[in-house]
């Protein structure tokens, strides 16, 4: 997911998206372990999306704290 699209979302939307991506990552890891996953690049993509969302949330926390 693009960073600009994430920055346009509210905190509630970001938290909801974060939960969705974490659930998808869990499912992908499960499929990977059982040998059913064909596109392993999806795991890294989801990890990076999680990091992007957390970074944006932390930046917003820092702005409000300052």
From Swiss-Prot:
InterPro entries associated with the record: Ribosomal_protein_uL29, Ribosomal_uL29, Ribosomal_uL29_sf
Keyword Lipid metabolism carried by entry: no
GO biological process, alphabetically ordered: translation
Disulfide-bonded cysteines: none
One of the record's GO molecular function terms: structural constituent of ribosome
SUPFAM superfamilies: Ribosomal protein L29 (L29p)
GO cellular component annotations of the record: cytosolic large ribosomal subunit
Organism domain of life: Bacteria
Signal peptide location: none
A Pfam family that the UniProt record links to this protein: Ribosomal_L29
Keyword set, alphabetical order: Ribonucleoprotein, Ribosomal protein
NCBIfam families registered for this protein in UniProt: L29
PANTHER family: 60S RIBOSOMAL PROTEIN L35/50S RIBOSOMAL PROTEIN L29, LARGE RIBOSOMAL SUBUNIT PROTEIN UL29C
Family note: Belongs to the universal ribosomal protein uL29 family.
Protein name as it appears in the record: Large ribosomal subunit protein uL29
Record organism: Syntrophobacter fumaroxidans (strain DSM 10017 / MPOB)
Organism lineage: Bacteria, Pseudomonadati, Thermodesulfobacteriota, Syntrophobacteria, Syntrophobacterales
